Amino acid sequence: MKDLLNLLKSQNQSKEFDAIRIGLASPDMIRSWSFGEVKKPETINYRTFKPERDGLFCAKIFGPIKDYECLCGKYKRLKHRGVICEKCGVEVALASVRRERMGHIELASPVAHIWFLKSLPSRIGLMLDMTLRDIERVLYFESFIVIDPGMTTLEKGQLLNDEQYYEALEEFGDEFDARMGAEAVKQLLEDIDLQAEVDALREEIPQTNSETKIKKFSKRLKILEAFLYSGNKPGDMVMTVLPVLPPDLRPLVPLDGGRFATSDLNDLYRRVINRNNRLKRLLELNAPDIIVRNEKRMLQEAVDALLDNGRRGRAITGTNKRPLKSLADMIKGKQGRFRQNLLGKRVDYSGRSVIVVGPYLRLHQCGLPKKMALELFKPFIFSKLEHRGLATTIKAAKKMVEREEGVVWDILDEVIREHPILLNRAPTLHRLGIQAFEPVLIEGKAIQLHPLVCAAYNADFDGDQMAVHVPLTLEAQLEARALMMSTNNVLSPANGEPIIVPSQDVVLGLYYMTRERHAALGEGMVFADVKEAHRAYGAGQVDLQAKVKVRVKEVAVDEDGNRTESFRIVDTTVGRALLYDIVPDGLPFEIVNKPMVKKAISNLINTCYRDAGLKDTVIFADQLMYMGYHYATRSGISIGFNDFEIPPEKYELVDAASDEVKDIENQYASGLLTQGEKYNKVIDIWSRANDKVSKAMMERLSKEQVIGPDGQPVKGEDGEDLMQESFNSVYMMADSGARGSAAQIRQLSGMRGLMAKPDGSIIETPITANFREGLNVLQYFISTHGARKGLADTALKTANSGYLTRRLVDVSQDLVVTEEDCGTDEGLLMTPHIEGGDVVVPLGDRVLGRVTARDVFTPTDKDNAVVPAGTLLDEKTVEMVERAGVDEIWVRSAITCETRHGICSKCYGRDLARGHQVNVGEAVGVIAAQSIGEPGTQLTMRTFHIGGAASRASAVDNIQVKHGGTVRLHNLKSIEKTDGSLVVVSRSSALAIADEQGREREWYKLPYGAVLSVKNGDQVEAGVVVAKWDPHTHPIIAEAKGTAKFVNMEEGITVRTQADELTGLSTMEVIDPKERPAAGKDIRPAIQLVDDSGEEVELPGGGTAIFFLPANALVTMANGAKIELGDVVARIPQESSKTRDITGGLPRVADLFEARRPKESAILAEISGVVSFGKETKGKKRLVITPKDDDAYEVLIPKHRQLNVFEGETVEKGEVISDGPSNPHDILRLLGVVELAKYITNEIQDVYRLQGVVINDKHIEVIVRQMLRKVEITDPGDTTLLSGDQVEITQVMEENEKANAADKEPARFERLLLGITKASLATESFISAASFQETTRVLTEGAVTGKRDYLRGLKENVVVGRLIPAGTGLAYHNERRRKRDLEEQGVTAADVEEALSAELNRES
């Protein structure tokens, strides 16, 4: 037995390797793999079921069918191992060699490999510089190609059809050589002199001017160099030998009834062999050319189908009309080799069952059914039984276990003790979807799960199933306990908030016990300590919610762990005192002295984790849960029909609304309103009515009369009935956050309100009934409409969200923390996140858990740093920074980290799931992908149509301050008018209001032409209007003073005058050039400023004060009017921007991560300079920007785009010229990486924030880092890179370092932004890319370039079956690398000498 095991071990001794290379197999290589040639298409003999000799299953070639037994049965058993039987020619070996031994087919004529021919760009085409159509014409025998023109007028590579060929033959005889088919292509490929071609192209590229040609050349140069450096031979793209897959990988299985189930590959191979044999025979017989040609073409098609069926022409189908699965189909797609067998394997020692709730379990436990445990731990039990001598053999032990003897259960108990098991619930969207627990044996067949981990698993008990896995090795058990135990996963990796938070019944119980009730039994009692209160409550002398005084003991723990106790008497309720009893030391009483709604409980656990540590938090969470369940049971809260109180005002409100709607219908009927206006008004009326009803309903629900202990209503001091917060069950459930919401209660006891159609538009007739009254048939049908769409959406959403997660994981999987500190001082500038003038996310929340990149200063004091650079900002530091009034902080970020492979611990900051600085080896890429992908299912799928209420919001025309404070003006350019007010003349100005601490509470953008009534540093009260502007026109402002002089303003030609009927004022409007008479087409009307003597006025910044007027501009002043500084010279009407659909939810997130260019994107200024307009073309305007000292830059802009800039203005690089959705590529090019990071982060956060999902910024930054891996070379300098190449940034850095070291010119480059799909496919590792998408393309490209995969990422290592280079696996990889470096150094003579002398000294 032992011998056999050793033999098996010796079989799979794999060599250690550090990289995998993919390349082209030469015919000799294929023959060297092969164990024999397959000559016949037969598979097995249908009578004897034995494989046919020389067939596709031949035992002589591929090995024996039974272990250690030849086919004829002459040699059996182990002792003949390795003997080759002389009768049947089969080697005696293990049958499993049939999985690894390959055969081959010698092809009678060469055949082009379809991947290199048809997968775009065609590699053969690039090498021969021919189009794919031409090559196909040669390959499929339609035309001849000249291989060697000899001394004739023909060219090498020229195509000739039959007639031309015969003409040429007559003319030149056999001077030249022209052939057709794959042999011609092979000959041409073999004739290429790679080095010469490369040199020629390298010389040619700098001499060409046309962009397209350079592109074409560099493509060809790339592939030629690839062949040159990888050592692949171009001729190998045309095969002469075809390898045959080992037979056990394409099995043939006899079914009952004499039929066979076979792999499609066998059919495809049979076709190839049949055609090949026929071709051989035809060639021997010297058959006519046309027949041979036809056979060769059929052979080519057969091999094509075998390699990649359906790639060319129609796919070959089997008997049942479905296309046969070719070799390419075997490896690609979800069912292919990569995703089905290499990245996702099924494992032994696992089971699954339904889950039920286990409320009495501790947090680290789960209930495991005895039956399952017995099955899962069987081998352990066998070994223990044998060890103890209770069973003599494994077989006896098996019997004992099957009989379930008493001793077996005792042993099971021992085996299971302290042996953690893993529980997994599909879908595993983030790492908390698999956690470790200690099993507790239970009766029954369902797994019991601790209620507090349900949130992490997203599990409920309506029939969910979970899988159990057993970690076998000691290391696995250790990791399960130290890293995966549910007690170690209290915080969510996505945002650092606790994820072990009570929900539903527990929240309800805790809320009920911490509410206060007026006039309850025992109100006003005083207790010496909590225990006394507990006794009184147990004796029924005081109510749980009674307001009492209790003396509590508070323990304060300072940072060094010193404890100080203090006692005080607090006003509280009995329930809160009881709750405080289980709170760990170090937390103040205030934290529980309020009704514990869900938010408060979450905050309590968070504070507990930060102040009392992990261990206490876990114990506390359990106690909290037990207590919550206990009091939820004691409360007796239940829902009755009467709890849904319908407010009596409802009916009046509904009637009033109906009357209003009738009026509007009448107005519409008499033609006073349009259809759209009527629709909007009706919907407005019903929304308002619905709001009023729900308000009345909530008021009614949330208040109730106080009833004393004697059952009588209690009167207040003024003699009125005393009211208190309601104890209505429905209200308590919603208020505590246990279940339900105001919106749901509204549907139950208010009115259901307006319903939506599937396309998102709102149906005019609302549902006035609620669920308590019941819906009539019409109402029921209206509500089914939207509900169905909801269900369909959910299904789609899940699939889309899963796909997004997969792409995210794929792009970020190889990002691991690899070093402590990369030493950069770059970072991102963090500011509070503003929306609509309000601070939505304060600065503190954004920088918590990050490392400062530069010293942090307050806005007032720029000398003394509040926090030095390189500090990890924890809760205490953040609080200090906020108190100091800091308004911006530079923090280190994943995007600016300079670590080569991976990222450094400092740039990442805090590990959110653990609360301390991140460890080296943490797979931050995958964590980021999971954190962004996991909430994906909560995002909406729809695009918001701006309609109804949203689109009629009045345009903003002023800034009204919400809080009092100090005015701060940011990058303001302004002109002071005569009355002292300021006029804004820059486009990127902003106004902020800071409070006493210096924190900016509000933040507003100031448009061009806004008039400010305050200056920088002024104090303002809340509610003051500080700025005004006209939202409908864009002003042109005089930056100098003088007299207006009209230029080219000719009535009826360039301008038209209109007089206002009411005021009598006349306005001049500039006519659009399209509508002008011929004489005025090219004239540009303008207003010039002149001084009193008629001389031109100079502008302060240089240049004359002349204002060109664009089309439709309005001028209200007369010629010769006096103009002061800051006056409005002319106004340009702004068409209200068309309402665009806002893409929201998941599609928006996907668009951002895929870096898609939006339609009609914003146009940004490419350089800084002065704006002017050039000659217009049809449908386009020509915008020219002229910088101070450089050439002008021109851009053509479609006429329908509205511009924000006007003639003669100065713009800064990257400023918006025409509004629209931002294009991330432009932001990166013009404003840089930091701005891009800010843009993508904010945009994605906006989508998630709308759904109430909190994700830390750094996860998004990690993904953005991966999207920015590639750069485009703009100038190669003296490096080996090519201009226009796209390469990894690390590669450029290494090249530049080499260049700098040799005092050569380094390469210059531009950062590129790739979408996540593209970035995944462009990774260094071909294994990772191939297992993601477009497998064929990735492998083809990899093979041609002879790519090496250094197995740096996680995915590649999973595929080759190694530990991943992250977490505990990183140590293994580092150790291997260290050993390898040592081996490379080898032993020097000095080392030997030293060792010898040491040895001699020791002996003496």
Swiss-Prot record:
Give the keywords, sorted.
Answer: DNA-directed RNA polymerase, Magnesium, Metal-binding, Nucleotidyltransferase, Transcription, Transferase, Zinc
MF (Gene Ontology): DNA binding; DNA-directed RNA polymerase activity; magnesium ion binding; zinc ion binding
The record's listing under Pfam families reads: RNA_pol_Rpb1_1 (PF04997), RNA_pol_Rpb1_2 (PF00623), RNA_pol_Rpb1_3 (PF04983), RNA_pol_Rpb1_4 (PF05000), RNA_pol_Rpb1_5 (PF04998)
Whether Transcription counts among this entry's keywords is: yes
- Which residues are listed for Mg(2+) binding in this entry? 460, 462, 464
Belongs to which family? Belongs to the RNA polymerase beta' chain family.
Q: Tell me the protein's name.
A: DNA-directed RNA polymerase subunit beta'
Q: Which organism does this sequence originate in?
A: Marinobacter nauticus (strain ATCC 700491 / DSM 11845 / VT8)
